[in-house]
């Protein structure tokens, strides 16, 4: 009975979303996107799309999303939004970071990306336009992937902070006490594999089209670069997402080294009390701010 009731609720919700979608004006970008997608299918093999397409999406999105944070350091007006104002970015640090990022991208992540084609073939993941899911279904599946990844990340990240193994793996990521956007994937190769597994679990469970893989890559990179940006920008639309961690939440993790282990949502830290030091720090900062006023 409960199962039937749940199915009825989800069916009603789906119908409601479809109805609202039918009322919206036609997306002017849909036809150009469809033409580009069909052109890609007609001119490239599935292996090329899955491998080189995924690599291009990852690299383009990663460096595009990192660009604003990189430029902020040269804009005096933006300095007031930097969270750790006493730790400015340095050329040496950013160059060191970029070299490791490129190594990880091409010697750790690229071999994994090369397996994308075989994954889609094994699970019969479609590429064609006719089976392209509606935007709200893709968004819902990306949300599911985010919840799964966040859960994996919280517990494995917390494990990597164990005193017996921290210095061997996760210490690399904490070389920068004040994070910056491009540093999001600066990590020991083993950490890239361990924490990166959480990204793929959702794909294995929820992927119904190759577009979901690229959409999820985009959303995950947007989130991780944002929380590593080192800047708390007002009117950041990501802060409208319920339970979203945000830059201040993760910045404190880099500054304090413990606590705030989640990647995207705050509920695991709240449930296990691993955000207690963060909230105490926020309260102390507010009191000091009032005294200075």
UniProtKB/Swiss-Prot annotation:
Q: How does it sit in the membrane?
A: Multi-pass membrane protein
Where is this protein found? Endoplasmic reticulum membrane
User: Keyword set for this entry?
Assistant: Cholesterol biosynthesis, Cholesterol metabolism, Endoplasmic reticulum, Iron, Lipid biosynthesis, Lipid metabolism, Membrane, NAD, Oxidoreductase, Steroid biosynthesis, Steroid metabolism, Sterol biosynthesis, Sterol metabolism, Transmembrane, Transmembrane helix, Ubl conjugation
Q: Does the keyword Transmembrane apply?
A: yes
Query: One Gene Ontology cellular component annotation?
Result: endoplasmic reticulum membrane
Look at the named UniProt entry and state the broad enzyme category this protein falls under.
Answer: oxidoreductase
Signal sequence annotation: none
The post-translation modification note in this UniProt entry reads:
Ubiquitinated by MARCHF6, leading to proteasomal degradation.
Transmembrane region(s): 55-75, 100-120, 199-219
- Its domain of life reads Eukaryota
Q: Where is this motif: Histidine box-2?
A: 170-174
Q: Where is this motif: Histidine box-1?
A: 157-161
Q: Name one GO molecular function term.
A: iron ion binding
Q: Give start-end ranges for motif Histidine box-3.
A: 249-255
This protein's major location comes to endoplasmic reticulum
Segments forming domain Fatty acid hydroxylase: 144-274
Task: Give the cofactors, semicolon-separated.
Answer: Fe cation
**GO biological process terms, semicolon-separated:** cholesterol biosynthetic process
InterPro entries the UniProt entry points to: Fatty_acid_hydroxylase, Sterol_Desaturase_Related
Q: In which pathway does it act?
A: Steroid biosynthesis; zymosterol biosynthesis; zymosterol from lanosterol: step 3/6; Steroid biosynthesis; cholesterol biosynthesis
Which E.C. number(s) belong to this protein? 1.14.18.9
What is the documented function of this protein? Catalyzes the three-step monooxygenation required for the demethylation of 4,4-dimethyl and 4alpha-methylsterols, which can be subsequently metabolized to cholesterol.
Under PANTHER family, the record lists: STEROL DESATURASE (PTHR11863)
UniProt remark on domains = The histidine box domains may contain the active site and/or be involved in metal ion binding.
For this chain, the family text in UniProt reads:
Belongs to the sterol desaturase family.
Protein name (record): Methylsterol monooxygenase 1
| Record organism | Mus musculus (Mouse)
């Amino acid at each position: 009975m409960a199962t039937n009731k749940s199915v009825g609720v989800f069916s009603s919700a789906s119908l409601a979303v479809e109805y609202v979608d039918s009322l919206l004006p036609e997306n002017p970008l849909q036809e150009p996107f469809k033409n580009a997608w069909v052109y890609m299918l007609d001119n490239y093999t599935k292996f090329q799309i899955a491998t080189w397409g995924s690599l291009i999406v990852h690299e383009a999105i990663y460096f595009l999303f990192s660009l604003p944070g990189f430029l902020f350091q040269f804009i005096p007006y933006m300095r007031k939004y930097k969270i750790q104002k006493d730790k400015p970015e340095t050329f040496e640090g950013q160059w060191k970071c970029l070299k490791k990022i490129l190594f990880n991208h091409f010697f750790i992540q690229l071999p994994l990306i090369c397996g994308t084609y075989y994954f889609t073939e094994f699970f019969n993941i479609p590429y064609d336009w006719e089976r392209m899911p509606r935007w709200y279904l893709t968004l819902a599946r990306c949300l599911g992937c985010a919840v799964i990844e966040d859960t994996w990340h919280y517990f494995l990240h917390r494990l990597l902070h164990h005193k017996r193994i921290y210095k061997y793996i996760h210490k690399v990521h904490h070389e920068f006490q004040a994070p910056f956007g491009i540093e999001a994937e600066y990590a020991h190769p083993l950490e890239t594999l361990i924490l990166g597994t959480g990204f793929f679990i959702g794909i294995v469970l929820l992927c119904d089209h190759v577009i979901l893989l690229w959409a999820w890559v985009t959303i995950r990179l947007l989130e991780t670069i944002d929380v590593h940006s080192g800047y708390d920008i007002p009117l950041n639309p990501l802060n409208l997402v319920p339970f979203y961690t945000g830059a201040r939440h993760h910045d404190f993790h880099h500054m304090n080294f413990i606590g705030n282990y989640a990647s995207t949502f705050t509920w695991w830290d709240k449930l296990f009390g691993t955000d207690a030091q963060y909230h105490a720090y926020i309260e102390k900062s507010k009191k000091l701010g009032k005294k200075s006023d």
